[in-house]
Amino acid sequence: IICVNNPEYYINEIFEDLTKKNYIIACRTENNLNSYTEEIFQRLEMKSSKYFNAGVMFVDHKKWLKNNTGELLLKQLEEIKEKIIYWDQDVLNSFFDGDYIEISQNINYPINLRWPMDTNEIKHNALFIHYQSNNKPWSIRSVFNKGSSFYQDVSIKTLNRYHLVKTVRRFDLFYLIINTLTFKFLNLKRPLNFYKIALLRIFSNRLNV
């Protein structure tokens, strides 16, 4: 999760709603019940017609404690552990079952680095961006996507270098070669620094550099 614009006004608004209303959490709905998503609702035995993304979740901490929510979630986990696919998100949705305040997409703005994207649109619309799927901005495969710049810009500003995490050596090397041959290195702000870190990471036994 990366904050790209000042969210203060919206966060205050969300917590004001949580305080006034009888809800514990506020989230973005990811799936509504339809013929394509009904498996999720049936698997988790949900009665509601909406399933939220837990990547960005606002919590009324006082209500959470008062209602002993943590302990109840652990009990829910034990009851549905054989049905879980999306880990904590499934447990949370099974427990709250649609009982949450809706937040807009710009507060939990989904990005999938598998696909090209308009970073200007993201800068204009998003408050928090959420890197979904297995394509994370710290992997060699994904750094060539312009969308990874929101994460890597923070690393360059704070560490003065790209932040890369080791995955599988042959895959890292494959994507490094492919993206170089297709000139995607032109998307990089500091290509020499990236290649130095990437090669060190690929040929090192360390998990990250």
Label for each model-derived stretch:
Residues 1-3, 27-38, 76-80, 102-108:
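Short linear motifs at secondary-structure transitions and domain/linker junctions
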Residues 18-19, 49-51:
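Solvent-exposed alpha-helices and their adjacent loops that cap or buttress functional pockets
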Residues 5-12, 35-40, 67-73, 140-141:
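A short secondary-structure junction signal
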Residues 1-32, 58:
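GT-A fold catalytic core of metal-dependent nucleotide-sugar glycosyltransferases
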Residues 1-12, 45-48, 79-83:
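N-terminal short leaders/motifs
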Residues 47, 54-209:
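A glycosyltransferase accessory/donor-loop signature
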Residues 6-10, 36-41, 83-85, 108-114:
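Short amphipathic alpha-helical surface micro-motifs
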Residues 20-45, 135, 147-151, 174:
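A short, conserved beta-to-alpha structural element at the edge of catalytic cores
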